[in-house]
Amino acid sequence: VKKYHINYANGRYLQAQKYCSDSAKQFGFDEVISYSLSDIDPEFYFKNKNILAQSRGAGFWLWKPYFISKTLERMENGDLLVYSDSGSFYQNSPQPLIDLILKDEKGVLSFELKGLMENVYTKRDTFVLMDLDEPKYTESSQREATYIWLIKNDFTVNLVKEYLEYAQDERIITDLISENKNYDVFKDHRHDQSIWSLLCKKYNIEPHKLISQWGDGMKNHFPNDTYNQITLHHRNPI
């Protein structure tokens, strides 16, 4: 299994990105790719300029499913792809997660933000336009898109294709005011994370304990996830 690791940064986060990438190399990833704005195909950029030109998330994080999809295209079936936010780095070996994903039937690891509910952090239009506006989705804990782990196979290629398609819809990914009334508990939209999270539930992808320091207090909720902290998620430019 060839292990790919990717991240993305604009000017502010380039130093943090380098630290993240260096830590991935240190812990044994075979190919470490540090993407930047210049790696986005001009045709894709201009097609989605209304989204990608926005400052929040350097384009509401649309680049994330784009680069995951782009990387999958160059990989062989059975290879591992890990996306990591540049505002984090590896402190310990990710081998426990590699062992876990190689046993996973779907080839996906998804990490749960226990207690952070979808209807609080996802605007109503996203539920409606993804045809997932029902309690089993709206009243569940969100999955994070800080780290996305995939084994390339037919299922994950199609999953990422769907992720990317929804992310190109301004009504779903951006902060445009929802035409459908938000749930009363709604606080703030989580953009590509809301999309990724809902797709994980749509396809019954198993939730796992967070791999950063934020997972330390969640061990009781995930007794089968015996791994300790693997990353430090700091969210800082340096």
Segments and roles (model prediction):
Residues V1-I238:
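Glycosyltransferase catalytic domains, chiefly GT-A lineage
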